[in-house]
């Protein structure tokens, strides 16, 4: 859950900075100088929308480490850290991925994966999770996070965020222009956007931004089911993932920082529409009803 919320908040911050900069530089005044230029507005919205999303993606790993105070294991200091690194290495090898950075952070049970690409990823687990689960369950959680990396979920989320950013910026400014024209009336000569445009476009941007987050969280929940299935495949058995989820259901799952809420193993919001994760019961049911992952059959040799 951590990854998505961090990504969303970073994205909002970047979009806000880019939007304010554009306003200061007079981009809005240019777009409305001779009536609203819809084509140029759409191009501007796409540039800011996708630009903000990709900047957030590039910052994701650094922000994740900072917000959780995660410590990257460069040299294992004990047997548990050595096991953790070795398990991630084995799972990554099965998934055909480069070895990600492995980190530990203090807190209640949770885990996350993040990074701008499969070759620059990070897998982190909390001390609370390591203390509350047996190694097979922890391995399943690690497999879930490795599956996120294998599925390219951060890049997918970035593209989705870029699309919704574009629509938010485009619609908020287009409606702001209409509101401004309505408030001015037909008799007032237009000399660029007025106060009605500035206030209404910002208000629309906030409202549409909240609605857009529902779309992003919907796709995030879908990716969680895929990561659970991917974990079962990497483990060669769905039971460890089911057991891990049941263990989480009996614990007080750690609340990752709001800006990181989308890539943790557990979590969700107070309202289902704004939750980055499906209910644990739904995830367990999906795993139980899925076809068991195939395991290699030993070849028979003739005597």
UniProtKB/Swiss-Prot annotation:
EC numbers on record: 3.4.24.-
Topology in the lipid bilayer: Multi-pass membrane protein
Active site: 145
Keyword Transmembrane helix on entry: yes
Matches recorded under InterPro entries: HtpX_protease, Pept_M48_protease_HtpX, Peptidase_M48
Protein encoded by which gene: htpX
GO cellular component, one term: plasma membrane
Entry protein name: Protease HtpX homolog
